[in-house]
Amino acid sequence: MGNYLNQDGKKFYEITHSDIYVDKTELLTYTNSVLQTLQKYICISRPRRFGKSITASMIAAYYSRGCDAKELFSPYKIARNLDFDTYRNKYNTLFLNMQEFLSRTKNIYELLDRMKRLVLRDLKREYPNVDYFDDTDLIESMQDVYQETNCPFVVIIDEWDCIFREYKQDKEAQEIYLDFLRDMLKDKSCIALAYMTGILPIKKYGTHSALNMFDEFSMINPGPLASYVGFTELEVAAQIGRASCRERVS
């Protein structure tokens, strides 16, 4: 268990034990269906406060080898799925909130360097006996771990597009960041699933060709994920009807 690699599921525990939680765990039936396929690249584009980070934490808790989430998920819909145990907590799961790295660094070089060093520390702590070709290279080290363990990675990148909002006019910084994402994720057999969240669709940043392996799901085109992201009218009505919620409204 690390800070970024194979987290312990406590974030999702806190979410599910809060006053309001709407069960969106059936999204995992979709992510399970695309694991290690060409459809394994998913980008969710929604405005703020639409539960993107909550869903990302749910995915991390379900796949992470850093915890046993059977009891945590047992009250929810995904637990009734026949494949619930097949994929649960079986993957090296990397959770990156890019806003966290952005707020602690001054430029894109510092951001990527800090992120790589922190993830590499987690990786080497979890797999100290792997024969790393270059233990300062994150992408190669992930491939080395996969080759020796046959355990692929689920990579979750929350707020992937915050770099574009911070460096609006810095095309070089944007290209460096995109090059990193492409090199890390594209055509890599060690990646079982890549799940990114952002505010605007990839094409809005003029970068669609660099990340053209991703399927995008937005408010306008939610596709098969329509009922899993955001809230339906019935879900909103059910929450308003709860006593704790009525007290807040009044």
Task: Identify the function of each model-found stretch.
Residues M1-R248:
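Phosphate-binding site recognition
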